[in-house]
């Protein structure tokens, strides 16, 4: 795959603003719309050597808002995604580094050592033995997101369908703090809904007739529903007749795969 560019002025800037509650989540729709035809060649990211760390005081001040942002960045299309060294550990980038100073970034101009990575390395054991419980939990979530993104063909090869247009006026869905879309591959449909809010939310997602036609799957047809984050299975269905209710934890997302 030829990567032409990173999606900095677009998805990164937009998702960052949403994570900081400075823009509505619905703005994310404009990112893929502006890249029609070249999105598969763009590199998605939330941290890199130029940008401030999510957990820094200059950004979100907390690594958890990065989880819904990472789900969107990793699963919205088939293009590559990157995590930066220590992002999965909530590295804050708040050291007072030599040339760079205390700017919320990890210096590329100085010889420097990050406490979060040292704690994961654990004096050569590489077992995360010195990580905090919060760091271990965050790393597990990132590992799930990345492994799902690379192993599920509905993500690596599936088509994308944005559901935000059908939920902008939905009184049971906050388009400022939640974002929802679908992916489809063969007999699999993936419903992805994320919550950028600090509190758990119960939403009711409208899935229009157009979605069933565009993705070519049956309205109100029984399917095996798998929660990809937990592995739990049940029999469920999607329909345009009534909204689909989902409970989303704070700063998180639900990845519900329907196999027909």
Task: Please name every model-derived segment.
Residues 1-3:
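Short, small-residue-biased leader/transition segments that mark boundaries at the very start
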Residues 5-10, 107-110:
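Acidic, His- and aromatic-enriched active-site or binding-groove loops in soluble protein domains
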Residues 9, 46, 112, 226-232:
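Residues at the C-termini of beta-strands that transition into short coil/loop
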Residues 13-34:
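Core domains of carbohydrate- and sulfate-ester-processing enzymes
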Residues 26-27, 36-48, 53-222:
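Loop/helix patches that line or flank the sugar-binding groove of alpha-linked glycan CAZymes
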Residues 30-32, 167-168, 242-244:
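Short, P/G- and charge-enriched loop/turn segments at secondary-structure junctions
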Residues 221-241:
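Solvent-exposed beta-strand/loop surfaces of large extracellular or lumenal domains
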Residues 235-260:
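C-terminal beta-strand-rich structural cap/linker in extracellular carbohydrate-active enzymes
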